[in-house]
Amino acid sequence: VLLAVIANGWMGNLLWLGYSLVGLAGLALLMALDRAYRWHLPDRLLWWTLLPLAMHYLGGSLSGLHRWGTNGLYYALPWWDNLVHFLGAGAAGVAAAYLLGPRLRAGRGATVFLATCVASTLGLAVEVYEFVGFLWFGTIDQGYYTNTVLDLYYNALGGFAGAWLWTRPRT
């Protein structure tokens, strides 16, 4: 995320510089929470989180080159947004299952359901962030209802898939 901040600042891509700064603040908050509450997140969860973050910031930051349109790979590759939402929510689902699962006195189904709800709620917060950015600051159009509903769908699907994969019995 820090590389995206530097690259977007260098290229004068103010839209994605703003997104990257918010992402950097969010990442710093997660690191502080991890340290304060001693979550000890597993390495594979951290790597799983790194992939969609890198895809998101790289994909959008390419718009600074003015080669792939205003929103970089999000406009050049129509499926990019769906994939990033699926993988990002999948990482959130894994984190929720990891953190909440041992504390629940319920089975795998309840853990997967709750983790999917957490991932979907985080995805909803992203959609509200995009809407507020568009409404208050005139950022780029996010695709209206179709884009928002598809994002919410892939958030739920990714959150479910991540939690389901994380909680599956290991052989």
Per-region residue spans from a language model:
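Membrane-interfacial alpha-helical segments at the cytosolic side of multi-pass membrane proteins
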Residues: 87-104, 135-140, 156-169
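Interfacial helix-loop-helix junctions of multi-pass membrane proteins
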Residues: 63-73, 80-81, 124-160
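Alpha-helical transmembrane segments of helical membrane proteins, especially in multi-pass transport
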Residues: 91, 115-122, 127
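Membrane-water interface at transmembrane helix exits
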Residues: 7, 34, 55, 59, ...
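Internal alpha-helical transmembrane segments of multi-pass membrane proteins
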Residues: 102-120
